[in-house]
């Protein structure tokens, strides 16, 4: 083979493997004590040495059929490793995390997923060029060095074999073998070696002193046999491996397996089957569900008696509500007659996990969600309304004819709205010189003015002399009376940092499925989604065009300016029951006749492209005496944070502590937040112009947050459990509702039951619909946010769960009664993380350990015994919760 090509290929492989291994060591070194890391460091490179040697052997074979085949295999390995290394380095550059190759494959097989992967393709390409350049520079010297090492190793290996032979065989056998062939190195080089020394290189000379009596030598048959240095090195390596085994056995919580892994071995994850974990419904805290704690049925409340079969849960299983129509809409399977008639054997055959995976169903009599048998169920519907709402609810003066649900992509709570003096504002100001602060604050005051009016939270924007900045509101002429505007939730969390999973939770009132990607799209929601509930109302009453809006039919629509084909979102949208959908595909068809419409990113168009569609929808619905449920998913605040060409971007981040490029992503994100705020103002103005503002409930919620390197070293949502990815705004906007700032540690799971509670409490449904809604709202797991929230009930905590993108690796857990937060590694491949959001709201002082026992010990020492007990409890209920979601979603991984 061409020696130059061979050297270059090997250099590519060597540089790729070495660069990614050093990165892996850097990312995981904090998981080891310094002494352990230093002692084990040589052993961590063992797999790398073996792989590099194997590739060297493949591409350095001599001519012939076998040699040519080996060279071809080696070439493929080198090229694949180059691509993998550049991708891994590029991923770390952008996110600060490690790339999972199984996930990369899922993206690669999806058209929209490929667009995501290619959106930052310049970075991996740059790393690939850097690797190629470095490989070209070092190829000759590297090849020569490796040749020397391999040749020397071969010689010493033969010496070692010969030395072992002298220890094993008798002198006579040794002499006999000596007459046949000698394996010992002598003063002459071994000419049989596949690798030749450069005779001009003094460093390659290997000589042997044969001085009798030299330490480490043995005289056999008149000839001195030396203990080769290879054996000494081998003993050293064996000692290191022994120490590593001891460390592993006595401290197996450390990530030793991660340190041994090296490219291209992780690529095998592409071919790995989905892991199958059987669910178990055994509640881990049995003392909390003892019979003395059971609750009887009371009105629409179904009672609560989880555990073994009993009258309370059996009554719910067999109930057939009076409001049930003859033809059930999709989503109401558990109320059908067929679900009541199955015997035990039929249930066993059809139930949740009776599949080829060998898992048995632990709750055979409950194939559907049963609120009476839910150990975590806490209802607050028996509480009165929040004090500011009580009078207006008694007067029944609020009218809710229409509902708009605005799901805002990557919207952080701190930016809805941005307020002067907050931690996020301080983060921005640190990038500016103090002399520029007034100018920057005036600029920042224009980021979220409409969000201020929606939430009722003032931005408090003023100069250093105390003078407020004057602002103009060009998008929305809000005429809401002072003291009114609705309920703003402070302290809310998302249920998942995966957009599609969050969308399902918001629309259906369900916890997400703790598996990677949007597998919920392949199943039926275990709770009726809001469009399905509205379709139930349509079927309960006659289809008339009555002037009484409570007798009118609901017309649900979904608007999204980008693709809904990513990870099967379109499939789930259809299942939810939207009758009118506008997405990128529809807009792109119309864009042929409207050249002003432009795509701004790999997903699609800006939200402003939807303005005419939304206006037409409202106009037609009001003309046809229909009640509207309009769901709108924004997208501009998604990576890559691009805005239309006509939008005037601003420089919000400064250069006081580095170049502007340092804050490029956050600056782009802030511009998209301002764009989204302006768009929201336009939406609210449309409602005003259509004359429906006073009868429309508008719900604003973020699907998840967005972490930047200004927050934490690891950016984005993928594999990143940082709190900035999970805090979201939630606001129930209505101009006739009193303004309420409700501080509560809840999640977006509570949105759907709150909407139903509002419809019932404001007399916005006819009697039949009211009966159905008042009954259904008791079946959802979330509490109502227009009533005092129950943080605990009879010793039970109100637990909050949030999955980390991509969904099946990490689960974050909080409870409404404490400020503590646990990150639970469901896949056992990452660290346990504890934080106290009360004293450390931005999670700057995390506690990380590789086992729960170690974490509990550290938390007990740094925080309190109570906190340590809490995290043990959180881990137990978290694991139960994850498996229970698989049962309820009827998840079949096969």
Label each residue range with its predicted role.
Residues 408-413, 495-497, 511-513, 561-566, ...:
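Short, solvent-exposed loop/turn segments at secondary-structure junctions
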Residues 396-417, 534, 627-635, 673-676, ...:
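Beta-strand elements within well-structured catalytic alpha/beta cores of enzymes
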Residues 487-513, 656-657, 715-769:
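Substrate-binding rim/cap in mid-to-C-terminal beta-strand-loop elements of soluble/periplasmic
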Residues 419-423, 688-737:
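Histidine-centered active-site microenvironments of extracellular/periplasmic hydrolases
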Residues 1-334, 892-894:
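Transmembrane and membrane-interface helices of multi-pass
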């Amino acid at each position: 083979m061409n020696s130059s090509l061979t050297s270059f290929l090997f250099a590519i492989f060597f540089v790729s493997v070495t660069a990614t291994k050093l990165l892996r060591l850097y990312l995981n070194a904090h998981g080891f004590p310094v002494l352990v890391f230093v002692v084990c460091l040589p052993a961590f490179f063992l797999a790398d040495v073996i792989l590099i040697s194997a590739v060297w052997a493949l591409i350095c074979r001599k001519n012939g059929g076998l040699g040519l085949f080996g060279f071809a295999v080696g070439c493929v390995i080198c090229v694949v490793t180059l691509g993998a290394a550049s991708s891994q380095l590029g991923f770390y550059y952008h996110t600060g995390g490690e790339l999972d190759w199984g996930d990369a494959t899922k993206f690669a097989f999806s058209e929209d997923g490929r667009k995501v992967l290619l959106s930052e393709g310049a970075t991996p390409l740059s790393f690939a060029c850097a690797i190629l350049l470095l490989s070209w520079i070092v190829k000759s010297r590297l090849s020569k060095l490796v040749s020397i090492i391999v040749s020397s190793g071969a010689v010493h290996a033969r010496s070692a074999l010969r030395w072992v032979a002298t220890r094993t065989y008798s002198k006579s056998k040794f002499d006999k073998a000596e007459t046949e062939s000698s394996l010992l190195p002598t003063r002459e080089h071994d000419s049989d070696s596949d690798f030749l020394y450069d005779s001009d290189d003094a460093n390659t000379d290997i000589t042997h002193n044969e001085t009798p009596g030299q330490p480490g030598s043995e005289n056999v048959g008149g000839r001195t046999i030396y203990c080769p240095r290879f054996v000494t090195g081998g003993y050293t390596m064996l000692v290191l491996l022994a120490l590593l085994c001891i460390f592993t056995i006595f401290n197996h919580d450390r990530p030793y397996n991660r340190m041994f892994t090296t490219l291209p071995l992780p690529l095998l994850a592409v071919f790995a089957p989905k892991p199958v974990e059987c669910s178990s419904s055994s509640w881990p805290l049995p003392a909390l569900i003892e019979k003395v704690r059971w609750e009887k049925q009371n009105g629409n409340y179904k009672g609560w008696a989880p555990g073994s079969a009993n009258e309370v849960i059996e009554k719910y299983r067999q109930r057939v509500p009076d409001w049930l129509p003859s033809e059930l809409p999709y989503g109401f399977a558990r109320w059908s007659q067929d679900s009541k008639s199955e015997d035990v054997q039929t249930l066993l055959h059809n139930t949740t996990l009776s599949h080829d995976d060998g898992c048995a169903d632990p709750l055979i009599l409950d194939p559907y969600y049963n609120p009476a048998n839910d150990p975590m169920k806490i209802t607050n519907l028996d509480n009165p309304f929040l004090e500011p709402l009580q009078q207006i609810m008694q007067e029944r003066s609020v009218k809710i004819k229409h509902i708009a649900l605005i799901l805002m992509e990557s919207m952080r709570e701190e930016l809805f709205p941005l307020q002067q003096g907050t931690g996020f504002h301080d983060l921005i100001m640190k990038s500016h010189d103090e002399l520029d602060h007034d100018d920057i604050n005036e600029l920042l005051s224009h980021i979220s003015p409409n969000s201020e009016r929606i939430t009722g939270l003032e931005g408090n924007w003023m100069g250093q002399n105390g003078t407020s900045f004057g602002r103009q509101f060009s998008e929305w002429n809000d005429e809401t009376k002072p003291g009114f505007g609705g309920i703003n939730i402070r302290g809310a969390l998302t249920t998942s940092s995966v957009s599609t999973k969050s969308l399902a939770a918001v629309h259906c009132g369900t916890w997400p499925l703790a598996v990677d990607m949007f597998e919920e799209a392949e199943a039926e929601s275990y709770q009726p989604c809001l469009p399905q509930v509205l379709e139930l109302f349509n079927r309960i009453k006659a289809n008339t065009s009555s002037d009484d809006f409570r007798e009118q039919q609901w017309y649900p629509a979904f608007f999204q300016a980008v693709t809904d084909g990513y990870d099967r979102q379109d499939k789930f949208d259809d299942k939810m029951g939207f009758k009118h959908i506008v997405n990128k595909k529809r807009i792109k068809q119309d864009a042929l006749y409207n050249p002003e419409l432009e795509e701004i990113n790999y997903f699609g168009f800006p939200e402003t492209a939807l303005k005419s569609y939304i206006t037409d929808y409202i106009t037609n619905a009001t003309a046809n005496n229909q009640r509207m449920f309009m769901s709108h998913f924004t997208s501009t605040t998604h990576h890559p944070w691009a805005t239309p060409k006509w939008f005037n971007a601003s420089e919000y981040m400064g250069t006081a502590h580095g170049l502007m490029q340092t804050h490029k992503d956050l600056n782009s994100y802030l511009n998209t937040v301002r764009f989204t705020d302006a768009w929201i103002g336009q939406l609210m103005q449309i409602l005003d112009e259509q004359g429906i503002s006073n009868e429309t409930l508008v719900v604003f919620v973020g699907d998840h947050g967005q972490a930047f390197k200004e927050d934490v070293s690891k950016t984005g949502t993928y594999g990143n459990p940082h709190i900035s990815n999970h805090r979201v705004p939630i606001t129930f906007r209505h101009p006739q509702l009193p303004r309420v700032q409700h501080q509560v540690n809840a999640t977006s799971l509570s949105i759907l039951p709150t909407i139903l509670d509002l419809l019932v409490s404001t007399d916005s449904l006819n009697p039949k619909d009211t009966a159905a809604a008042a009954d259904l709202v008791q079946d959802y797991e979330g509490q109502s946010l227009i009533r005092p929230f129950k943080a605990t009930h009879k010793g039970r905590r109100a637990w909050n769960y949030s999955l980390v993108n991509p969904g099946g690796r990490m689960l974050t857990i909080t409870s409404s009664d404490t400020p503590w937060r646990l990150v639970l590694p469901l896949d056992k491949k990452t660290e346990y993380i504890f934080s106290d959001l009360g004293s450390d709201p931005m999670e700057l002082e995390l506690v990380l350990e590789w086992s729960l026992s170690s974490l509990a010990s550290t938390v007990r020492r740094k925080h309190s015994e109570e906190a340590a007990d809490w995290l043990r409890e959180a881990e137990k209920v978290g694991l139960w919760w994850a498996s229970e979601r698989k049962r309820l979603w009827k998840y079949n991984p096969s």
